[in-house]
Regions:
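Hydrophobic transmembrane alpha-helices
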Residues: 1-54, 58-62
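Gly/Ser/Thr-rich beta-alpha loop segments that engage phosphate groups in nucleotides
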Residues: 58, 66, 124
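Short hydrophobic alpha-helical segments that form membrane-spanning helices or hydrophobic packing faces
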Residues: 62-66, 164
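Alpha-helical transmembrane segments of multi-pass membrane proteins
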Residues: 45, 49, 86-94, 158, ...
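Membrane-embedded alpha-helical hairpins and interfacial helices in multi-pass inner-membrane proteins
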Residues: 33-38, 42-43, 76-84, 104-179
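Interfacial aromatic-anchored transmembrane helix boundaries in multi-pass membrane proteins
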Residues: 26-42, 66-100
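Short helix-perturbing small/polar motifs within transmembrane alpha-helices
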Residues: 2-6, 12-26, 63, 83-131, ...
Length: 179
C-alpha cells in the first residue's frame, strides 16, 4: 500500500483548503458588527493568502473565488456586486501566493516578497474588476476610489496580513504541518 506522508497528502490539502474556506466565511463575523472595521481589517484575505502558501495555487484560487460569493449568498455580505470584485481579488491572492510558495522556503525575505507580490496583484485585479463591473452599470471607478479602496482604507488589514501570514506559515512549517 502506497501511502503519501501527511505533509504531501491530497487529503491534507483538501482539509486545509476546507479550513481556510470556513475561516474566510467566519472571520468577518469578528469584525462584522462594525462594517468600517471589517473592511479595514480585510478578514477574508487572511485565510486565502494562507491557503496559497499551504495548499498551492489551484486550491487557493478556488477558495479565494468561492469564499466571497458563498458568503454573499449565505449572509448577504459582502453585497453584490462587491462580492464579484472580491472573488477575483481573492482568487488572485490565492493563485499568486500559491505559485510563489516554493520561493518562500528560501528565506524570510522571500516569504515576505511572495506575500507582497500576491497582495499587490490581488489589489490590481480588484481595481480592474471594479472598473469592469461599475462600467457595466454606467458608473465610474476613479483612481481616487481605487486608492481609497485598495490602499488607504485597507492599511490596518495590510499590516495584519504582513504580520500574521509569515508567522502562521513559519509556525506551521516548524511544526511540520506544512511543506
Amino acid at each position: 500500500m502506497n501511502v503519501a506522508p501527511l505533509n504531501k497528502s491530497p487529503v491534507r490539502t483538501l482539509t486545509y483548503s476546507a479550513i481556510c474556506l470556513a475561516l474566510a466565511l467566519v472571520l468577518p463575523f469578528l469584525t462584522g458588527q462594525i462594517p468600517q472595521i471589517g473592511s479595514a481589517l480585510c478578514p477574508m484575505h487572511l485565510p486565502v493568502l494562507l491557503c496559497g502558501f499551504l495548499c498551492g495555487p489551484w486550491w487557493a484560487a478556488a477558495v479565494g473565488f468561492v469564499a466571497p460569493l458563498l458568503r454573499s449568498a449565505i449572509f448577504t455580505m459582502p453585497p453584490m456586486p462587491a462580492a464579484i470584485a472580491m472573488a477575483f481579488e481573492l482568487c488572485t491572492y490565492g493563485l499568486v501566493s500559491g505559485l510563489l510558495r516554493h520561493k518562500s522556503h528560501k528565506s524570510l525575505g522571500w516569504l515576505y516578497g511572495s506575500l507582497i507580490i500576491a497582495m499587490v496583484a490581488g489589489r490590481l485585479v480588484w481595481g480592474v474588476a471594479q472598473v469592469v463591473i461599475l462600467g457595466l452599470s454606467d458608473s465610474a471607478f476613479s483612481w481616487a476610489a481605487f486608492w481609497a479602496g485598495a490602499i488607504a482604507n485597507a492599511v490596518p488589514g495590510i499590516i495584519v496580513q504582513l504580520i500574521l501570514i509569515p508567522l502562521l506559515v513559519l509556525a506551521l512549517r516548524k511544526a511540520k504541518l506544512a511543506d
